[in-house]
Swiss-Prot record:
It is linked to Platelet glycoprotein IV deficiency: A disorder characterized by macrothrombocytopenia without notable hemostatic problems and bleeding tendency. Platelet glycoprotein IV deficiency can be divided into 2 subgroups. The type I phenotype is characterized by platelets and monocytes/macrophages exhibiting complete CD36 deficiency. The type II phenotype lacks the surface expression of CD36 in platelets, but expression in monocytes/macrophages is near normal. Coronary heart disease 7: A multifactorial disease characterized by an imbalance between myocardial functional requirements and the capacity of the coronary vessels to supply sufficient blood flow. Decreased capacity of the coronary vessels is often associated with thickening and loss of elasticity of the coronary arteries. Residues 30-439 are extracellular. This is Platelet glycoprotein 4. Changing Y463A: No effect on cell surface location. Loss of oxLDL-induced NF-kappa-B activation. Loss of complex formation with TLR4 and TLR6. One of its GO terms (biological process) is MAPK cascade. Glycans are attached at N79, N102, N134, N163, N205, N220, N235, N247, N321, N417. Interacts with THBS1 and THBS2; the interactions mediate the THBS antiangiogenic activity. Upon interaction with a ligand, such as oxidized low-density lipoprotein (oxLDL) or amyloid-beta 42, rapidly forms a complex with TLR4 and TLR6; the complex is internalized and triggers an inflammatory signal. Through its C-terminus, interacts with PTK2, PXN and LYN, but not with SRC. LYN kinase activity is required for facilitating TLR4:TLR6 heterodimerization and signal initiation. Upon interaction with ligands such as diacylated lipopeptides, interacts with the TLR2:TLR6 heterodimer. Residues 460-472 are annotated as: Interaction with PTK2, PXN and LYN. It is found in: Cell membrane; Membrane raft; Golgi apparatus; Apical cell membrane. It comes from Homo sapiens (Human). PANTHER family: PLATELET GLYCOPROTEIN 4, SCAVENGER RECEPTOR CLASS B TYPE-1 SR-B1. The chain crosses the membrane at residues 8-29, 440-461.
Length: 472
């Protein structure tokens, strides 16, 4: 009887030990299995989960616009007063709804090339008004022409054309005209061939961004989605040194197994440069654990604070000898037009930039850019890309409508918020196919290990207790 009991206790301890060992072995084996499956599914080729969602995003993406309506145009033009602006919006468009075009795999270098077509559909139900709403904004053509043509004789000719067309420093335009283009009366009088249509995003519809050529990950999963070339080049030709490099992905996805310590680099054609994001916090997105990465203020710092940014400073006067920060002069990629990009309401910008503008209220929560990334797959499941479009206008002795200005202005025209969030159906699929299976495997591992250890310890204690009684 004693033997049977002892044998049973030993058998229980052995079973517990086996379960614990099996649970322990399952951990690395399970991790390897997960890695193998993920690596297979994030490759950008026909038949994978990644490819299907990459060719045409299943997420609805919206671009909201807030326009800075100028309240005191005459005071500014006559007295060089601070510009008083009133934010109006949002005006919402659906974007990025078109599938990638000319998708071509290259087996030799394991890349895939494509064009990203552009399209925008106005969403009245998500907007405060219509595309016919009027705004008082800086005259884009007058500001640009006076900057591009600085020869005084040429500016005298420009002045006569500006006066003849009855143009001024400011203008009234509809939302549709401001965004997508209008025929400018001043440019229409220029006696030599110039583009007479002006708009902040002209041309947009029926155009495409690219060609992009990205690594498909077949030979090296750590390079998947990373851009090899953009428009056939590895550099942009806008900046000096490392600032001109095309780094990272397009931010729609990143190589799998993202770590919190990583600096995620990505390229944005909207701002004509590569930029980066750093980990901020863990976020639960519809039951899916994601990492929130944000653009840090350091990315917009002056070279004085962040020496890596020295090559983004391209002139000395407006930047106050490269000490100003928070705005990026992208005129080189806008055919010389004095376009400056910043975060909305000049968030993270130096006081000298925003000082001439009244009515701004920078708010980090509302105006910063972030990416919510599922770390195992590297997929961006939610994002908010926020930026502001500004135009530089300077005094001019020869152009009457700019003659009374006593300082330079970086004038905010609008800011945009482009957002996308994984839909409920896609989130359910993602939970069942990815995070659910991983969590289930982890649960099984812990149960086997825990039960095994408890059984082994309990049966061994019982066995020792029984032996002690038997000896007595």
């Amino acid at each position: 009887m004693g033997c049977d009991r002892n044998c049973g206790l030993i058998a229980g301890a052995v079973i517990g030990a086996v379960l614990a060992v099996f649970g322990g072995i399952l951990m690395p084996v399970g991790d390897l299995l997960i890695q193998k499956t993920i690596k297979k599914q994030v490759v950008l080729e026909e038949g994978t989960i990644a490819f299907k969602n990459w060719v045409k995003t299943g997420t609805e993406v919206y671009r909201q616009f807030w326009i800075f309506d100028v309240q005191n145009p005459q005071e500014v033009m006559m007295n060089s007063s601070n510009i008083q602006v009133k934010q109006r919006g949002p005006y919402t468009y659906r974007v990025r709804f078109l599938a990638k075009e000319n998708v071509t795999q290259d087996a030799e270098d394991n890349t895939v090339s494509f064009l990203q077509p552009n399209g925008a559909i106005f969403e009245p139900s998500l907007s405060v008004g219509t595309e016919a709403d009027n705004f008082t904004v800086l005259n884009l053509a007058v500001a640009a022409a006076s900057h591009i043509y600085q020869n005084q004789f040429v500016q005298m000719i420009l002045n006569s054309l500006i006066n003849k067309s009855k143009s001024s420093m400011f203008q009234v335009r509809t939302l549709r005209e401001l965004l997508w283009g209008y025929r400018d009366p001043f440019l229409s009088l220029v006696p030599y061939p110039v583009t007479t249509t002006v708009g902040l995003f002209y041309p947009y519809n029926n155009t495409a961004d690219g060609v992009y050529k990205v690594f498909n990950g077949k030979d090296n999963i750590s390079k998947v989605a990373i851009i090899d070339t953009y428009k056939g080049k590895r550099n942009l030709s806008y900046w000096e040194s490392h600032c001109d490099m095309i780094n990272g992905t397009d931010a729609a996805s990143f190589p799998p197994f993202v770590e919190k310590s990583q600096v995620l680099q990505f390229f944005s054609s909207d701002i004509c440069r590569s930029i980066y994001a750093v980990f901020e916090s863990d976020v639960n997105l519809k039951g899916i654990p994601v990492y929130r990465f944000v653009l840090p203020s350091k990315a917009f710092a002056s070279p004085v604070e962040n020496p890596d940014n020295y090559c983004f400073c391209t002139e000395k006067i407006i930047s106050k000898n490269c000490t100003s920060y928070g705005v990026l002069d992208i005129s080189k990629c806008k055919e010389g037009r004095p376009v400056y990009i910043s975060l909305p309401h000049f968030l993270y910008a130096s006081p000298d930039v925003s000082e001439p503008i009244d009515g701004l209220n920078p708010n980090e929560e509302e105006h910063r850019t972030y990416l919510d990334i599922e770390p195992i797959t590297g997929f961006t499941l939610q994002f908010a890309k926020r930026l502001q479009v500004n135009l530089l206008v300077k005094p001019s002795e020869k152009i009457q409508v700019l003659k009374n200005l006593k300082r330079n202005y970086i004038v905010p025209i609008l800011w945009l918020n482009e957002t996308g969030t994984i839909g409920d159906e896609k989130a359910n699929m993602f939970r069942s196919q990815v995070t659910g299976k991983i969590n289930l495997l982890g649960l099984i591992e812990m149960i086997l290990l825990s039960v095994g250890v408890v059984m082994f310890v309990a049966f061994m204690i019982s066995y020792c207790a029984c032996r002690s009684k038997t000896i007595k």
